[in-house]
Curated annotation (Swiss-Prot):
NCBIfam families: myo_inos_iolC_N. The lineage of its organism: Bacteria, Bacillati, Bacillota, Bacilli, Lactobacillales. InterPro entries: Carboh/pur_kinase_PfkB_CS, DKG_kinase_firmi, Myo_inos_IolC, Myo_inos_IolC-like_sf, PfkB_Carbo_kinase, PfkB_dom, Ribokinase-like. Keywords: ATP-binding, Kinase, Nucleotide-binding, Transferase. It comes from the Bacteria. This is 5-dehydro-2-deoxygluconokinase.
Length: 326
């Protein structure tokens, strides 16, 4: 029987309150715009906008903000049947952003007792996971129990079912106790994941070792289940490494940068679309880079996620300009 979903993401769905006023610090900002946030939710939204069939497993607050998140995700085509409402009073995570300049933007997270961290293992459905080709796991969901156990249960079920596991490192220090704890749980998932995606700094967190080279990192991780590792290095672009020994690189597209946050989630959505459609790893890196460039040029992260026509048009225009300039 063919699977219903191209991918299911599990973990954090939250609310972003993005500063509408630019060039000023958060303490001086008075006006914010509300959007859906959280790395797994953003990846799910980006994937759905690209035409993927997407499901989501997570927990949100049973209030107006929780309803807003669920309704928005459903409106872009995501199946929300496995998004659980917290009935114990936990509130959804909030993220405030400031945009001081294109080079200097920051986030302030309120995640104490956040509802997504209270997803329980019994709320993860084997029958639901059996309907997907791919499971996207975000590192933040491993930060606390019971979400940690829910994520690990989903991982084990996916491996048993032959579902491809994508581990997006998504390191956020706010909810972790210490570096050793983070590295321990990151390594547990990384050793079972088929594809691992993160920044160079996030891989240092995974290994709890600063200053490692990409070659040292992949030599360690390819001893386990991973067959593809994607390491992002900011303006230097990104590299995809295969267990077979192939290396692919793509740089970054020039764009008018408004903010620095949101790039990683859009990169993952674009990359995974091309990867799952077998367009080649160089094209996957290109799609990821283009999606990231589109999102960092706009105020929102989730609502700025491009559809496939917008993504390919951006790439065609950028490549045409590059040829013209050369």
């Amino acid at each position: 029987m063919p699977q219903k979903f191209d991918l299911i993401a599990i973990g954090r769905a939250a609310v972003d309150l993005n500063a509408v006023e630019y060039n000023r610090p958060l303490e001086d900002t008075k006006t914010f715009a509300k959007f859906v946030g959280g790395s797994p939710a953003n990846i799910a939204i980006g994937s759905a906008k690209l035409g993927q069939k997407v499901g989501f497993i997570g927990k949100v607050s049973d209030d107006q903000l929780g309803h807003y998140v669920t309704q928005y995700m459903a409106s872009v085509g995501i199946d929300t049947s496995n998004m659980v409402k917290d009935d114990t009073g936990h509130k959804i995570g909030l993220t405030f952003t400031e945009i001081i300049s294109p080079e200097e933007s920051d986030i302030l997270m309120y995640r104490n007792e956040a509802a997504d961290l209270y997803l329980n293992a019994h709320e993860v459905s084997r029958a639901y996971l059996a309907q997907t080709k791919m499971l996207v796991i975000s590192g933040t969901g491993l930060a606390q129990s019971p979400s940690r156990e829910a994520i690990l249960k989903a991982l084990l079920i996916a491996k048993e079912l032959g579902v491809e596991v994508i581990f997006e490192l998504d390191y956020r220090p706010y909810t972790w106790q210490n570096a050793e704890e983070t590295s321990l749980y990151y390594q547990l998932v990384a050793q079972k994941a088929d594809v691992i995606i993160g920044t160079r700094d996030e891989f240092d967190v995974l290994e709890n070792h600063q200053g490692r080279t990409d070659q040292e990192t992949i030599a360690t991780l390819f001893q386990y289940d991973a067959n593809l590792i994607v390491i992002k290095s900011g303006i230097q672009g990104s590299n995809a490494y295969t267990k077979a020994g192939e290396t692919y690189h793509f740089g970054v597209f020039k764009t008018k940068v408004l903010k620095s946050f949101g790039a990683g989630d859009s990169f993952a959505a674009g990359f995974l679309y091309a990867y799952q459609h077998q367009l080649g790893l160089e094209t996957a890196l290109k799609y990821g880079s283009a999606a990231a460039s589109i999102v960092i040029s706009q105020l929102s992260s989730s609502e700025a996620m491009p559809n496939l026509d917008q993504l390919t048009a951006f790439i065609e225009k950028a490549e045409a300009q590059e040829v013209h300039q050369s």
